[in-house]
């Protein structure tokens, strides 16, 4: 019942309250209190070992240090990430100093050997948005060289051999076949694919110090197994399993395999003797210990220890005689799900499993028999247009319907769209039906008077669109080119100051080009640290109909890092031209207007601008489930524009400050709203002008 009205705020919470007497917030608090009690009882029965943490400056926000891997110079290479940090390769020195090496975009872990670092990285298909690849990237710490070893691969969990010459990785191809693969670490060529006849799901391969064996986990329906494979012989030896333990990150140490397991109910580091198959508890920590990496010749274990503010790097001595035999350790998993299983269990599991599921006939897919999914609603603020709508797709995502409404802040008009896209070909084809208002505001330079003309437009258009995506290292790129033609009917025109504005029809042609490139950012960043955007718009009406017009606009933005953390400096240049002499139709302006001024129409505009954006505070304050105040931010700006209005030049200059509060409404995490105020000093008028802002739009 709740699912049918999922679009209505708090539907699930109200249903819970009606059914069990507790809403979502109350149920969450009850659950946390219950889990806290159970966790304390669990901790009392599990030993906690002392580890030595690498001293670092305490972070202000949640920050993670993953996958510690010691280097020959005494430093420790880690992956650092968090609310305030992008994924970085960082050297940690014993005294706590951090030396950032570079940003990177790993799918998970990384691996280092012979001063080389490798990881797998997701890269999109250039054209098909739902198709992606996972390629192996390599970074040379000596030369600083970065390159991809594979193209359009399907690899994950890559590990360098101790001598840095080979890579063991898992390949999961488009036919859902999972294999262990050896690659050449210089060329990326496949050296060997190991047979996996049962198609077990493989994870976390790791090399033995001599490079002759590989340990990994194998998962099938019956559970996980810990397996050692001979590199040359391909012989497989299961050390234990299958088990329902979520064993991860195995590593060789002498005659042992170290690994992660939640056997005690808490993630801890364990060992198994490869000869006797006896298991031992090495490291147990209050909130979990992860990513073991032993240094055999020093008998030292590096790991990540979880704290309330994230993972921290720690170390401990490896003393096998002090390890705790698994037989003496009490397994106390919380099994919080157990009451539900007991409550819902059928009286006879064997009979249930035999008859629980219907047999469905396998038939060929027919594109004409579509299963439509209403899956998303959205708000898209893209100056000067604010749009909101919802999307319906078919199962293959080749056809999409969108119904939306947009508000043009320059004209203060609203329109409604129904759009159909077909993406089964290259290019993409878009059919759009639009109905709504248009407006033009004419400015009389002599009398400084503004006159509005409003009319109604109904239009239909067909557009052909070529889209390309690209990821290279830490940069993402996107460009699109589209051309379109349409039919527009105009009604209700009354103003004729720039020609004979007639009701009637027109056949518009349009051209759009967008090019974007930007560097990955942290969650708290306001803008990219490095990024570029170029937009080109062109419109014309075919001669011979009641209305004719021409329009051209070009805009470029460059983002730079600022002086402080999460600060940005930006520069913008924009130009726009509307044909006037001999033309009686004005296309809508495609660009934001000069900050600090209310929009009016013009023949030409050239605008340059600078801005500096920075966060002020993070209130982290909530008004129940209705509003969550996330961030207060500011933006100092300067705009200088030269306009041509009624054949006269009009310079506009403004300097000012935007203050905005970023917040979430109704516990909706996907959309961050922004509201604020703009205070601008206008040079020509010698006054201070104040505007209210919503999503960056003036109200």
Can you name each region flagged by the protein language model?
Residues 76-77, 117, 167, 214, ...:
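Hydrophobic beta-strand positions that form the internal "hydrophobic ladder"
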Residues 433-435, 446-450, 463, 495-636, ...:
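C-terminal outer-membrane beta-barrel translocator/porin domains of Gram-negative envelope proteins
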Residues 511, 608-610, 657-659, 687-699:
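Outer-membrane beta-barrel "beta-signal"
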């Amino acid at each position: 019942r709740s699912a049918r009205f999922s679009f209505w705020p708090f539907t699930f919470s109200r249903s819970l309250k009606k059914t069990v007497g507790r809403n979502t917030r109350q149920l969450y608090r009850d659950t946390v209190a219950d889990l806290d009690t159970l966790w304390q009882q669990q901790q009392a029965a599990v030993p906690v070992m002392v580890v030595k943490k690498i001293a670092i400056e305490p972070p202000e926000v949640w920050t993670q240090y993953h996958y510690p891997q010691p280097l020959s110079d005494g430093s420790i290479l880690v992956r650092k990430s968090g609310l305030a940090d992008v994924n970085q390769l960082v050297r940690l020195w014993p005294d706590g100093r951090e030396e950032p090496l570079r940003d990177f975009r790993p799918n998970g872990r990384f691996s280092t050997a012979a001063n080389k670092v490798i990881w797998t990285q997701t890269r999109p298909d250039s054209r098909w948005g739902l198709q992606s690849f996972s390629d192996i990237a390599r970074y040379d710490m000596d030369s600083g060289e970065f390159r991809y070893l594979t193209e359009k691969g399907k690899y994950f969990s890559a590990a360098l051999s101790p001598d840095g010459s080979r890579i063991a990785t898992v390949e999961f191809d488009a036919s859902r076949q999972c294999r262990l693969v050896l690659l050449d670490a210089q060329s990326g060529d496949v050296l060997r694919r190991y047979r996996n006849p049962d198609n077990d799901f493989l994870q976390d391969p790791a090399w033995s110090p001599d490079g002759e064996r590989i340990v990994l986990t194998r998962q099938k329906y019956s559970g996980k197994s810990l397996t050692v494979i001979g590199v040359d012989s391909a012989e497989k030896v299961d050390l234990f399993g299958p088990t329902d333990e979520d064993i991860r990150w195995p590593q060789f140490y002498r005659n042992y395999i170290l690994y992660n397991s939640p056997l005690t109910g808490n993630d801890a580091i364990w060992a198994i003797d490869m000869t006797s198959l006896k298991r031992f508890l090495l490291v147990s920590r209050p909130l979990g210990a992860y990513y073991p990496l032993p240094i055999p010749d020093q008998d030292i274990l590096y790991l990540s220890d979880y704290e309330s503010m994230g993972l921290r790097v720690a170390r401990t001595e490896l003393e096998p005689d002090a390890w705790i035999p698994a037989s003496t350790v009490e397994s106390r998993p919380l099994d919080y799900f157990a009451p539900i299983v007991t409550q819902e269990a059928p009286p006879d599991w064997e009979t249930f499993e035999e008859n629980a599921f219907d047999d469905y006939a396998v038939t060929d897919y027919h594109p004409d028999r579509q299963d439509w999914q209403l899956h998303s609603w959205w708000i898209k603020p893209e100056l000067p247009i604010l749009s909101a709508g919802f999307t319906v797709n078919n199962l293959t995502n080749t056809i999409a319907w969108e119904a939306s409404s947009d508000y043009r802040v320059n004209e203060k008009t609203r329109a409604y769209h129904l759009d159909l896209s077909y993406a089964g070909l290259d290019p993409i084809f878009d059919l759009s039906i639009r109905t709504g208002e248009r407006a033009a505001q004419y400015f009389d330079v002599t009398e400084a008077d503004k006159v509005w003309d409003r009319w109604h437009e109904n239009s239909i258009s067909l557009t052909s669109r070529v889209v390309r995506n690209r990821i290279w290292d830490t940069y993402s790129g996107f460009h699109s080119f589209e051309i379109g033609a349409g039919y527009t009917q105009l009604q209700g025109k009354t103003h004729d100051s720039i020609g004979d504005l007639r009701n009637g029809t027109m056949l518009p042609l349009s051209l759009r080009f967008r090019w974007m490139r930007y560097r990955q950012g942290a969650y708290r960043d306001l803008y990219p640290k490095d990024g570029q955007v170029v937009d080109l718009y062109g419109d014309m009406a075919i001669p011979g109909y009641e209305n004719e017009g021409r329009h051209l606009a070009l805009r470029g933005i460059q983002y730079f890092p600022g002086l402080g953390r999460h600060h940005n400096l930006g520069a913008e240049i924009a130009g726009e031209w509307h044909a006037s002499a001999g033309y009686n139709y004005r296309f809508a302006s495609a660009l934001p207007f000069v900050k600090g001024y209310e929009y009016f129409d013009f023949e030409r505009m050239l605008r340059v601008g600078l801005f500096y954006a920075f966060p002020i505070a993070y209130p982290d304050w909530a008004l129940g489930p209705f509003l969550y105040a996330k961030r207060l931010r500011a933006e100092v700006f300067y705009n200088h524009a030269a306009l041509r209005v009624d054949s006269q030049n009009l310079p506009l200059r403004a300097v000012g400050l935007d203050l905005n509060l970023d917040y979430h409404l109704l516990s909706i995490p996907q959309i961050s709203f922004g509201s604020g105020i703009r205070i601008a000093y206008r040079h020509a008028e010698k006054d201070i002008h104040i505007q209210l802002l919503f999503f960056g739009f003036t109200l």
